[in-house]
């Protein structure tokens, strides 16, 4: 069976979480200025969102491997420089899927679109959150990206 590697751009990974004790992963962090850090203290998830996303994935696909990039830091905020750098890093790895559980609501420049298209042409599935309100969500609205949207089911 082919191993599946999922790249996650989010708030990092709680390496002490029981789900990841036997999971193969690589990790780094990208600062808002685009600098990369391999220090565990920098990619450790202090927010919980990235760990929650990875936990959902591993629950559905137990043999998955990860390349985790903390592009949000402790503040839970990021910028386009960090996101684009994270995508460039993942482009140079062996990921099969890239998960971005966030949306940018202001139209970015062409570089983000170009990166997503290039990843798609390289047979890498790129998935991103589509916001649940009016307006466009980037990069989910690009044709080369699978937009994922949550919602409430009536009577549940």
Where do the model's predicted regions map?
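Conserved beta-strand scaffold positions in the cores of enzyme catalytic domains, especially
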Residues: 25-27, 66-68, 145-147
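Subtilisin-like peptidase catalytic core
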Residues: 39-104
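Active-site core segment of subtilase-fold serine proteases
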Residues: 1-56, 60, 64
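Cofactor-binding loop segments of dinucleotide-utilizing enzymes, especially the Rossmann-like FAD-
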Residues: 11, 71, 131
């Amino acid at each position: 069976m082919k191993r599946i590697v999922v790249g996650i751009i989010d708030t990092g990974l709680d390496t002490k979480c029981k789900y990841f004790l036997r999971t193969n992963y690589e990790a780094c962090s990208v600062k808002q200025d685009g600098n990369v850090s391999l220090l565990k203290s920098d990619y450790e998830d202090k927010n919980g969102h990235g760990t929650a996303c990875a936990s959902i994935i591993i629950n559905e696909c137990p043999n998955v491997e990860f390349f985790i990039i903390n592009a949000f830091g402790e503040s839970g905020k990021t910028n386009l420089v960090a996101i684009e750098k994270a995508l460039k890093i993942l482009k140079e790895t062996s990921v099969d899927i890239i998960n971005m559980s966030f949306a940018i609501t202001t139209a970015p420049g062409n570089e983000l679109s170009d990166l997503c298209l290039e990843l798609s042409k390289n047979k890498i599935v790129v998935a991103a959150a589509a916001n649940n309100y009016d307006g466009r969500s980037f990069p989910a609205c690009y044709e080369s990206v699978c937009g994922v949207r949550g919602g409430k089911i009536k009577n549940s």
